[in-house]
């Protein structure tokens, strides 16, 4: 069922061969809706290398796991109701295929369906530096309605562990999908009677920021 019928969002998460598998695992663990998973061949390999997990370890977190070669799949058709496709991590090659209309895998095909049906498409792209073509492809997809998020985690909450850093970045993905993130930048300030500009650095740090007068880019 779609969100309008079941009350839950139906989401396909695609994992490709770019670095960044911990982001995908953290997102799956959020249990944000009726989530389905598609793994590419290289996505499986990177998942094992970066997290030590295999496909079977993720089965309890999702409704079903699909092969990326399964083009005879409900997500390949716009006639089936789903709310979003999230590709995390998304390789430069995968982004290029989607930008140029190549839907030769379940992940790329479902992304194209999301675009044509005006459903949410989120690409978490992990690559550095970007070639010029990647910027052009990202711009094209953005104009078509996709949300392109470079895999660039924030530091303004002063994470103490790698897990905290990953979770803070996943909050960004969750927010883009329309869910409430666990933590927001300076959220406490909204409930404070004193403006942030009047807080000392110590007070700002107590609120989870290193500089009370700093502003994000």
Regions found by a protein language model. Give the residues of each.
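A cross-family phosphate/adenosyl-ligand binding-site feature
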Residues: 1-122, 126-217
